[in-house]
A protein has these predicted regions:
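PLP-dependent amino-acid enzyme catalytic core
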Residues: 1-266
Length: 266
């Protein structure tokens, strides 16, 4: 049961909008997804009764449980990023893609690798559930290991492991020296934002007033918000990014007042 909710206001200016999330810049990702045999728009549910009860004009929820049969949006990012890597490979089916995850991102990487006849190796942080590991193992020839490391250490280990073996490291978190692939993943996530905008227009909604996004590691929230901000010319809906109290990294980052990356302990 929720005991309390803390909210902190961040600031957004047009100078903060990255060019790679612009509508035209993300068009190749949408074109790629449309070429996938498994692709179809996921539903945008119209919660009419809830909206009526709460006294608002409309509430709409993007249902990503239908995406590619994987029950999550993550494959949008992994598939696009891996497609760009594979395009440079002489033998795409011989490639190995490595990542660290506690679940859905790993499934996305495994699924995208399988589609190319390639293989994924996934390292999961301590405490990950065996059923989630089994779900990834069930995709192609994926190898999965639940480590004794926390998430950040598992990411570093996966990166070093990929470099040591000549494999491709495909992670949805980046740093100053690792940006291209995380940015490609983030671009992939914008496909669902574009779908939602067009579906809202089908409901007669020119622009939503408010938007709620899950935080996760930040790639989806940042990608979708950045794209939406570009789409509406720097004037996005009032946006709330929600995250658990125990891992409120975005909250602490905004609280710090720093414009750049912020380290959070714990």
């Amino acid at each position: 049961m929720v005991k309390s909710i803390s909210i902190i206001e961040g600031k957004l200016s047009k100078k903060c909008l990255p060019d790679f999330l612009a509508v035209e810049a993300t068009a190749p990702a949408r074109a790629f997804h449309r070429e996938l045999p498994e692709y179809s728009e996921t539903p945008l549910a119209n919660l009419k009764n809830l909206a009526k009860i709460l006294g608002v004009k409309g509430i709409y929820v993007k249902d990503e449980s239908k995406r590619f049969g994987l029950n999550a949006f993550k494959a949008l990012g992994a598939s696009y990023a891996i497609s760009k890597i594979a395009a440079k490979e002489k033998n795409p089916s011989k490639a190995v893609y490595v990542t660290a995850t506690d679940g859905n991102h790993g499934r996305g990487v495994a699924w995208a690798a399988m589609k190319l006849g390639a293989r994924a190796e996934v390292f999961m942080p301590v405490g990950s559930k065996e059923c989630r590991a089994d779900a990834i193992r069930g995709i192609g020839d994926s190898k999965v290991e639940i480590t004794d490391m926390n998430y950040d250490d598992a990411v570093r280990f996966a990166s070093d492991y990929a470099k040591k073996n000549g494999y491709h490291f495909v992670q949805d978190t980046g740093n100053a020296n690792y940006r291209d692939i995380p940015n490609d993943i983030t671009q992939g996530y914008t496909t669902m934002a574009f779908e939602a905008i067009k579906q809202l227009e089908g409901y007669g909604v020119d622009k939503p007033t408010h938007m709620f996004l899950q935080a996760g590691v930040g790639s989806m929230a940042g990608g979708v918000l950045g794209f939406i901000a570009h789409y509406y010319d720097g004037n996005p809906p009032v946006t709330t990014v929600a995250e658990p109290w125990e891992v409120a990294c975005i909250y602490e980052s905004i609280k710090s007042g720093c414009e750049g990356p912020t380290s959070v302990g714990g």
